[in-house]
Every structure is written in structure tokens, then in C-alpha cells.
Swiss-Prot record:
Catalytic reaction annotation: glycolate + NADP(+) = glyoxylate + NADPH + H(+); (R)-glycerate + NAD(+) = 3-hydroxypyruvate + NADH + H(+); (R)-glycerate + NADP(+) = 3-hydroxypyruvate + NADPH + H(+)
Task of the protein: Catalyzes the NADPH-dependent reduction of glyoxylate and hydroxypyruvate into glycolate and glycerate, respectively.
Native source organism of the sequence: Enterobacter sp. (strain 638)
Entry-linked Gene3D superfamilies: NAD(P)-binding Rossmann-like Domain
E.C. designation(s): 1.1.1.79, 1.1.1.81
Keywords from the UniProt entry: Cytoplasm, NAD, NADP, Oxidoreductase
Gene name as annotated: ghrB
PANTHER family reported for this sequence: 2-HYDROXYACID DEHYDROGENASE-RELATED, GLYOXYLATE_HYDROXYPYRUVATE REDUCTASE B
Pfam families: 2-Hacid_dh (PF00389), 2-Hacid_dh_C (PF02826)
Family assignment from sequence similarity: Belongs to the D-isomer specific 2-hydroxyacid dehydrogenase family. GhrB subfamily.
Subunit (UniProt): Homodimer.
HAMAP family named among the record's database cross-references: 2_Hacid_dh_C_GhrB
Protein name as it appears in the record: Glyoxylate/hydroxypyruvate reductase B
Annotated Gene Ontology cellular component terms: cytosol; plasma membrane
Compartments in which it is found: Cytoplasm
Length: 324
């Protein structure tokens, strides 16, 4: 008899078929309490859980006594209670390798669009304001040759450094938990303390997961250290930044502009001051959102669940120790 799994995300047909070859699949739209109550028997018998963007906490896990593995279609897993999973010896699988290049593309797009004011001036053209040769009030700033500061030199940071170094001849500063020899050797990146990076970088790019240590890592004091000409980019997790402090820094002119793909509250409230600022590019968390990459992430997540429920946790497992 096949193990039972809960699927709470729509998959492409071929991936759905692959999943069903290995498991008895119960599909639903979400994991809210009403859904869980309606499908109580399926949750009670499920060995696996596959999806994304829903909260998986103690309250849900108590409804799933036979759960052995969860697989998220994402690299981030801050919506999972990892301690609760560990206590119950439930494996957590994710997709850290499937989206690296695409998210780095998004980061570079934010750098370019903020520097050259792409969104702002495109809207001005649509509004009929381009009636003569443009003047300085339409100008942006250069990207090539400017100093890029990367906070978080993981896989995505390394991919961004590659684009910046070879594509735009940008000197690179970085701050991370440890020195990154590949970044230093391939891209001439220079490790420095966060304070130094904030003071020297023309572009400050934040690429960090959300943890207790990184929550509000960048706040009022950090923005005050940046150049007034600095452009701030965040495509990691919204709560790593104190959003009120960011808004204040922009309003006071303490930094030049911001490009944001993540926010403290998502979707971003329609009354957010960020949406009124012409020097802010706000994206709806599209970091990995291409057809190709989202397919690859889903395929990886399916394979991850198959592997996990067969005892193979050599790759893409957040907590392999629970399988010991």
C-alpha cells in the first residue's frame, strides 16, 4: 500500500503523475483550520506533506501523528516550526539549488531599475510627460564600476557577485558568517565587517534568511551609516529589515533609493508609504518567479519527498539529524 501524502499546491500534470506513482495523494488548496477539520482523516494518516507558503506549526503537526517528512517548494522555511519538526523527528526538505541563478537575475534587475529609474521614467512616458529632450530630472546613476556590498554570501550572493564582477566591473564587498574563498578568488570580493560595508558600498544588497539573529538586522542605525547616494536592495526576507526605519531613511534622504522584492507584511498593504515613493521599486516577491524555475522547484520538491520517505536525506534536507 502506498504511503499517503497531503498536497497543498497545484503541480504541473507530469509532476502530479510522478507523485501519484509513489503515493496516495490528497490535494487541497490550503492548510487553514477549516480545511484540516474537513479532511481530518487524510491529515491523520499522512506520512508526507508537500506545498509552499502555508504555516506549518505545532497545531497542525498535532493533527498529523504519522507525518514523517515535509517538502516545501521553496528555499526559505521560516513558515515552518523547525523545533517542533525536530522534536517529532519529521524531516524538512527544501529547494536551495533550483532557484539560485533566477533570484540573482532579480537582484541585478533591482540594481539596474533603481539606478536608472526604469519604472519611474517608464510611467512618466506613459503619462505623456516626454514632450522634449530629457533633462537632469530624468537622469539616473551609473552601475558599472560602482561598489557592490553583499550581505549574505551564499549561493545567491555568489551568483550576484559573478554578474556584478564580470558584467559590470563592480568592486565587491561582502559580509557573511565566514570568509568565502571562491568569492574572493573568482570575483576579487573583499570580506569586511557590516559597518564598513554599509559605509563604503554604493549598492547594499541584502540576501539573508530570516532567523532570530537576522530579524531587523538592518534598522535606523544601519541606514544612518550608509552613503546618502547609496541604493538599498532586499531580496532575502522582509523582516530582516526594520521597514519603518527604511521608510524614514528614504523620507529623510539618508539613502538615495531602494529596490525591494520582500516586505515585513506580504502582500504589501496598499497604504504603505513605500508605494508613494518614486525612488522605490516594489516587486511582489518575484525572486524565483519564472516558469522554468518554478517548474524546477516543484520537480525538486516532489523528488525530495520521494527521497525523504525512502530514507534518502543526503541532499536538500534542513534537519537530516532527525533521521539518524
Amino acid at each position: 500500500m502506498k504511503p499517503s501524502v497531503i498536497l497543498y499546491k497545484t503541480l504541473p500534470d507530469d509532476l502530479q503523475k510522478r507523485l501519484e506513482e509513489h503515493f496516495t495523494v490528497t490535494q487541497m488548496k490550503n492548510l487553514n483550520p477549516e480545511t484540516v477539520a474537513e479532511h481530518a482523516d487524510a491529515f491523520a494518516s499522512a506520512a508526507g506533506l508537500l506545498g509552499s507558503s502555508e504555516k506549518v506549526d505545532t497545531a497542525l503537526l498535532e493533527k498529523m501523528p504519522k507525518l514523517r517528512a515535509t517538502s516545501t517548494i521553496s528555499v526559505g522555511y521560516d513558515n515552518f516550526d523547525v523545533d517542533a519538526l525536530n522534536t517529532r523527528k519529521i524531516l524538512l526538505m527544501h529547494t536551495p539549488y533550483a532557484l539560485t541563478e533566477t533570484v540573482a537575475d532579480t537582484l541585478m534587475a533591482l540594481v539596474l531599475s533603481t539606478a536608472r529609474r526604469v519604472v519611474e521614467v517608464a510611467e512618466r512616458v506613459k503619462a505623456g510627460e516626454w514632450t522634449k529632450s530629457i533633462g537632469p530630472d530624468w537622469f539616473g546613476v551609473d552601475v558599472h564600476g560602482k561598489t557592490l556590498g553583499i550581505v549574505g554570501m551564499g549561493r545567491i550572493g555568489l551568483a550576484l557577485a559573478q554578474r556584478a564582477h564580470f558584467g559590470f566591473n563592480m568592486p565587491i564587498l561582502y559580509n557573511a558568517r565566514r570568509h568565502h574563498s571562491e568569492a574572493e578568488e573568482r570575483f576579487e570580493a573583499r570580506y569586511c565587517e557590516l559597518e564598513t560595508l554599509l559605509q563604503e558600498a554604493d549598492y547594499v544588497c541584502l540576501i539573508l534568511p530570516l532567523t532570530d539573529e537576522t530579524h531587523h538586522l538592518i534598522g535606523k542605525a544601519e541606514f544612518e551609516k550608509m552613503k546618502k547616494s547609496a541604493i538599498f536592495i532586499n531580496a532575502g526576507r522582509g523582516p530582516v529589515v526594520d521597514e519603518k526605519a527604511l521608510i524614514e531613511a528614504l523620507q529623510k534622504g539618508e539613502i538615495h533609493a531602494a529596490g525591494l522584492d520582500v516586505f515585513e507584511q506580504e502582500p504589501l498593504p496598499v497604504d504603505s508609504p513605500l508605494l508613494t515613493m518614486s525612488n522605490v521599486v516594489s516587486l511582489p516577491h518575484i525572486g524565483s518567479a519564472t516558469h522554468e524555475t518554478r517548474y524546477n522547484m516543484a520537480a525538486t520538491a516532489v523528488d525530495n519527498l520521494i527521497n525523504a520517505l525512502n530514507g534518502n536525506v543526503e541532499k536538500n534536507c534542513v534537519n537530516p539529524h532527525v533521521n539518524a
